């Protein structure tokens, strides 16, 4: 009997070790405990909540995305200065006013400002205001051997200045603000990035949707900026969608080829807003 129990326990342990990788990850960002990281090392008044990637227990599930989390800098505080030789980053300011430290520059930033941060350039965030500044930090791995087209200067814009427009394939009830694309982009406000292919805001009419779909070459993260609804993450062979309640502050990471989308939960009033970012999956290079 003792021998049989040992076998059962061993099989149970093996099943845990061999658990299938998740199709998506879900995080309630305000509920994430702050964690120490390079952005907060020896820094005064800064806290980082790791949602996905570095600092999160499921970091290995992300292949091309290095990190995604929320940085808060208190009044009079500052983050550490950081630099990554093989990672491009985007900051998106959720609330408050701060000072972006970028190389030798000190650039004031406000709510809804977003910016592209080149690999190898030291950067951080300071706060000289009377209220906290809160921002999303997004990092994307640069594969070895990738040729970068450097941006001539700091690229920064505000999403309030980007027009809403329809995007083919996503229906009439969602409009898009195309914030940032690659250096080859001709449609985005900023053409800046290498591996990050699209940063955008979706504006949903009450009861609207962007029509669930999938991406064969990219990972994606949705972050609910305002409102509530149902997040679509994954689906079955019968066409049924995996739908999960989502509200402001919720974030979802979606693997490539998984069904992704959003259904607005609003019936009237303010439109629901979702900030989304897609980046290339680092497929192995084919050698000649």
Label each PLM-derived region with a short phrase.
Residues 78, 82-111, 221-248:
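A short beta-strand-loop-beta hairpin characteristic of the jelly-roll/cupin
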Residues 97-99, 122, 132, 228-230, ...:
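Structural motif
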């Amino acid at each position: 009997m003792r021998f049989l129990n040992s076998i059962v326990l061993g099989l149970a342990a093996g099943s845990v070790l061999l658990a299938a990788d998740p199709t998506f990850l879900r995080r309630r960002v305000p509920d994430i405990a702050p964690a120490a990281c390079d952005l907060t090392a020896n820094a005064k008044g800064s806290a980082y909540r790791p949602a996905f990637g570095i600092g999160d227990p499921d970091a290995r599930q992300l292949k091309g995305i290095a990190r995604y989390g929320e940085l808060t800098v208190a009044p009079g505080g500052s983050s550490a200065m950081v630099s990554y030789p093989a990672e491009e980053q985007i900051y998106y300011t959720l609330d408050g006013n701060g000072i972006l430290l970028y190389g030798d520059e000190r650039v004031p930033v406000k709510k809804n400002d977003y910016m592209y941060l080149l690999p190898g350039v030291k950067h951080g965030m300071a706060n000289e205001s009377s209220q906290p500044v809160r921002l999303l930090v997004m990092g994307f791995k640069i594969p070895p051997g990738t040729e970068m087209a450097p941006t001539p200067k700091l690229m920064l814009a505000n999403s309030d200045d980007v027009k809403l427009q329809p995007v083919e394939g996503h229906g009439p009830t969602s409009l898009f603000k195309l914030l940032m694309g690659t250096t080859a982009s001709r449609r985005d406000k900023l053409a800046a990035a290498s591996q990050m292919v699209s940063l955008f805001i979706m504006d949903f009419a009450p009861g609207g949707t962007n029509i669930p779909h999938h991406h064969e070459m990219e990972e994606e993260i949705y972050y609910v900026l305002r409102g509530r609804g149902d997040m679509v993450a994954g689906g079955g062979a019968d066409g049924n969608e995996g739908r999960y309640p989502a509200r402001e502050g919720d974030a979802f990471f979606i693997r490539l080829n998984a069904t992704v989308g959003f259904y607005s939960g609003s019936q009237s009033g303010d439109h629901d807003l979702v900030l989304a970012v897609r980046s290339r999956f680092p497929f192995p290079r084919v050698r000649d």
